[in-house]
Amino acid sequence: MSTDNNGGIKRPDGKVNAIDTDYQIGQDNVALKVGPFGLDIHNRVFAISGMAIVLFVVATLTFRQQVEPFFAGLRAWLVSNLDWFFLASGNVFVIVCLVLIVTPLGRVRIGGTEATPDYSYAGWLAMLFAAGMGIGLVFFGVSEPMSHFSSALGGVNIENGVRTDWAPLGGAVGDTDAASALGMAATIYHWALHPWSIYALLALGLAIFSFNKGLPLTMRSIFYPLFGERVWGWVGHIIDILAVVATVFGLATSLGYGASQAATGLNFLFGVPMTDTTQVVLIVVITALALISVVAGLDSGVKRLSEINMILAAMLLFFVIIVGPTMAILTGFFDNIASYITNIPALSMPFEREDVNYSQGWTAFYWAWWISWSPFVGMFIARVSRGRSVREFIICVILIPSTVCVLWMTAFGGTAISQYVNDGYEAVFNAELPLKLFAMLDVMPFAEITSVVGIILVVVFFITSSDSGSLVIDTIAAGGKVDAPTPQRVFWCTFEGLVAIALMLGGGLAAAQAMAVTTGLPFTIVLLVATVSLIKGLMDEPRLSTKAVKKDK
């Protein structure tokens, strides 16, 4: 892949910088020497986002007693007043993806009409498969289906005219089959079409404006059709600052979940005290390991760790399918998809919801969290998807990871529900969220081994997320440079750990959720505007002929 004199990526069809701009990648950067280390940073984006995060960490650690109720109140206010906005936005992203699939815009090719894929179809699909795995699946694979199942089983509860239960929709009082179907549908809703539509749109925007338009691989580039040269000024600075801050807090939320589950697993297996100190030590140790991975580089560090973790995750998944209720899992996979499709209209309704605890406590938080993660996942997907048509890109980016998520939730959540319903195993029903995975594995063969594998999965996902996340953040904070000095990634990796510690000490997972929602709110607006700009940009792109599209297939 070559570049032009502006630093833009040269299109294979000979056209360079489809957008005519004098901007050069890194032209606003400042080169600094800090001791033996050299830095190459976008002055305003790096400085403002870095200072904002430093102030947050210092304030949170200084006023621990005060910030805990503040975070709880902030989260409650945001999700209770703006849940409709998050849900409606999620629906918009899904609809736009469907429109791009069925309209002629789907024939636009990422990289230009003559572009060829950088990776084989199998290799590309494998990377999309990997994108669907992470700390979230390990943490929520058992806990979320069981939570929605138990809430649905309890049915609707109203006190003083206010619904106080957490059941999705109307629940299913005493009917375990109906409660299971509803619980799985409510879970899959959070892990399938909607989140992956968010990732697909942002990834597509980054890919089109980098590979097709020759602009830097940063968030601001997507907005060029709407704001023109102003994206290189404060309009763009604000967009990139929001992207950096949202990504840091989105990652910190995931790291908080990972630390909580790893500490719970160590307590369950080895009696390690479940304290703030334990979780802080875990975050420090795992962040240190992530730093080693950062220094080792992509090929020696995160790539190998990702391969190891994918193998471990696949082994644990197949173990649960084979040792668990195999036929129930295999048939449940299709039944759960059917239940999900049936319940999508009700689950995605943004207004006049009666199940407000579910829609506000789960869905609004999830959408904000996914949106804050979108620069991280989106940039990874964009960088590996050159040469694919828009239609092919969206279908695969949504369907492949969604299928992985549905299979994982069906295997782990379905096994746990079966243990309770068919075997009377109440520990998995009553356990706290971080403990449910280990409670499920505890009554299966080789429990100690699989539980240790579960902890290793969380730890390595923690490391790879932190490493990859620091790369994405650094690319944005370095003005789109993908080869910025390693010390900058070390800086951001360290900051992610510090933010996770601050959130853990300032209110635990509730604080992490509050900040994910808070930073996700402005970035939702950014992503909605980016969607409009993306469509405008796609309309200017040459499209493959119908014959060429059929030939590719």
Curated annotation (Swiss-Prot):
An example molecular function term from Gene Ontology annotations: transmembrane transporter activity
Topology term for the membrane: Multi-pass membrane protein
Subcellular location: Cell inner membrane
Record field: transmembrane: 43-63, 85-105, 122-142, 191-211, 231-251, 278-298, 310-330, 362-382, 393-413, 443-463, 490-510, 515-535
Keywords linked to the UniProt accession: Amino-acid transport, Cell inner membrane, Cell membrane, Membrane, Transmembrane, Transmembrane helix, Transport
The keyword Lipoprotein appears for this protein: no
Keyword Transmembrane helix: yes
Pfam families, sorted: BCCT (PF02028)
GO cellular component: plasma membrane
GO biological process annotation, one example: amino acid transport
Main location (coarse class): membrane
NCBIfam families: bcct
Biological role stated in the UniProt entry: Involved in the uptake of osmoprotectants. Can transport glycine betaine, proline and choline.
Family: Belongs to the BCCT transporter (TC 2.A.15) family.
Name used for this protein in its record: Glycine betaine/proline/choline transporter VP1723
Organism: Vibrio parahaemolyticus serotype O3:K6 (strain RIMD 2210633)
The organism's taxonomic lineage, starting at the top: Bacteria, Pseudomonadati, Pseudomonadota, Gammaproteobacteria, Vibrionales
